[in-house]
Amino acid sequence: ICDLTKDVSLICHFGALVDEVPFNDMLGANFIGSYNIWEAARLNNCKRVVYASSIHAVGMYKRTKTLRPKTAHRADGFYGLSKCFTENLARMYYDKCGIEAVCLRIATCSPVTTQRSLTSWLSYDDLVQLVMRAIDTAHTGYSVIYGVSDNDRSNLSNIDSGHIGFKPKDNAEIYANKIFADDLTEELADEGNKLHGGPFASTDLGVSAMDKMKIVYSHKGD
């Protein structure tokens, strides 16, 4: 990593295992991997790291609670814990070494297929805008910002991160009629959907949550 990051001023760190898995399986990619990125940034005098964090760093809060960037961590599993760790790692490297960091707490960056995603959706266009703002903003210091579109039902607030200049354009409400026309029995039966972390919050530690997620990896109709 040190060789790959020579003579760069900014690193976008989006690499990770993106599921709930046993801790030892998570350790290399999500914990040590993040340390390696920031240590390489320090050794190579890199000015900033843009990090793909996750809603799962605060996934155990009830969905009725509005979350802000300054909301304390409440991880919903080992995956969420790895995001908490890296946000704290980023804070330490900023305080000790002056490396700026923008931690993007990405919510649901996939097609809207559930009632929960009406609150948490981040469109691809808004994701691109968010990353570009994290890159182009002149001075970020250490910042946390939620990756979420301008959804009518959202209770993720970026009131503490206005300096990033992220102004999402899309709104999941355009999918609401279709979602409520579907059978929601299975979704509503999952206690995790009462929490910001969704199925990750109700899945046992170390057990995959992706099987419970109604994610459709298709751009048809977009």
Where on the chain are the PLM-derived regions?
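Glycine-rich NAD(P)-binding loop of the Rossmann-fold in SDR/ketoreductase-type enzymes
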Residues: 10, 25-36, 44, 73, ...
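NAD(P)H-binding glycine-rich loop region in Rossmannoid oxidoreductase-like domains
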Residues: 1-29
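SDR active-site strand-loop-helix element
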Residues: 11-15, 49-55, 104-106
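Conserved Rossmann-fold NAD(P)-dependent oxidoreductase catalytic core, especially the SDR/UDP-sugar
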Residues: 36-76
